[in-house]
Amino acid sequence: MAALPRQGIIILTYVLAALELTCLFMQFSILPYLSRTLGLDSVSFGYLQTTFGVLQLLGGPVFGRFADQCGARAALSLSFLAASALYLLLVASCSPALPGVFLLFASRIPSALMHTLPAAQMVITDLTAPTERPAALGRLGLCFGIGIIFGSLLGGTLNTAYGIQCPAILAFVVTLLGAVLSFTCVPATTKEASVQSAPQGGTKASVFDLKAITRLLLLPRVLPVFLVKVISGLPSGLFLVMFSIISMDFFQLEAAQAGYLMSFFGILQMMIQGLVIGRLSTHFPEEALLRSSVLVFAVVGLGMALMSSVLHFCFLMPGLVFSLCTLNVVTDSMLTKAVSASDTGTMLGLSASVQPLTRTLGPTLGGLLYRSYGVPIFGHVQLMVNLLVLLVLWKKPLSQKGEKAR
């Protein structure tokens, strides 16, 4: 097959990311019903979610190094094959003749290698100029929004019409198709020849070289940005992890109403990350956008501390989505610019591990805060944490740190 042009590879990468995220949210939409069918209580379901988060957390940085060393084709193919294995085990767990609970927990194991979004980010980073990078990475938000909307919609509709196995079977077929497209259409590597030939003078580092991963994280231009990403986004991440419970208990929403709210969230994410951030990045420096996301986080936190109905939350949601999208896109762009082109995959793998970290801590820490203090505590924590981060960014700008590091 003839090699695709650069723009064709970028478009294919967006399509592959949208397919994988749609399948992922199809899985999320049926997982609570499947676990209930298999007799799992809420505690066991929490263990299932935590297992998924821990495996993604551990696998992210290692997968990033694999992508740097083996190339985009191998990384995307491996991610889709791992996803296919997960959905196949999920299909098997639906069968009454098989040990469903064991297979359901076993289906979490391949998730350690399911990192299509970081692999797609690496491809986009390698194929775009630094000035174009925020807008190009922002367009992946369209893929995420498509995944939320169509994945949730297809999962619920197919589950109701054809049974709980149907979404898992469809996801298995689609991810197999994604693996075939990755293997046949994506180039072996998207990095420049000079970057590929750089490590030939010495021994090739191992994919599991934790020292190299740690060294990358501790670079002077990397660690401050990474800490801002983790600390600023953690309070809202805890709220979103607990949102399914909050929507039932605090907002008193039915399942269908909660689905509409998530669709609204997905549409906002598509619009803001796909259309707004790219335009803002051409007019404002990245550090100004980062400060604005932290400031809006603080304002939204104040609103969350005072809200009493779902209508109030709907008014706050655009600000929340803007902050989340801007924080993720801008920090990813800054982190990839802070490392050499040969390390972008590892860096994006580290960055992608932030969300699994929140998913791992969220059920325990978020549940404790919610039971002890109620919904307003999430707003108070978000307000105080982001005001502190904003103060630090104001006193010690990241650009000054970068200049000193050079």
From Swiss-Prot:
* Subcellular localization, as worded in the UniProt entry: Apical cell membrane
Q: What role does it play?
A: May act as a transporter of organic cations based on a proton efflux antiport mechanism. May play a role in the transport of chloroquine and quinidine-related compounds in kidney. Plays a role in the regulation of lipid metabolism.
Q: Which InterPro entries match?
A: MFS, MFS_dom, MFS_trans_sf, Tet-R_TetA/multi-R_MdtG-like
Family under the similarity heading: Belongs to the major facilitator (TC 2.A.1) superfamily. Organic cation transporter (TC 2.A.1.19) family.
Major location (coarse)? membrane
What protein am I looking at? Answer: Solute carrier family 22 member 18
Keywords, A to Z, come to: Cell membrane, Ion transport, Membrane, Symport, Transmembrane, Transmembrane helix, Transport
The protein's gene is named Slc67a1
A single Pfam family, by name?
MFS_1
What if the gene is knocked out?
A: Deficient mice show decreased hepatic triglyceride content under refeeding conditions following fasting.
User: Cellular component per GO?
Assistant: apical plasma membrane; plasma membrane
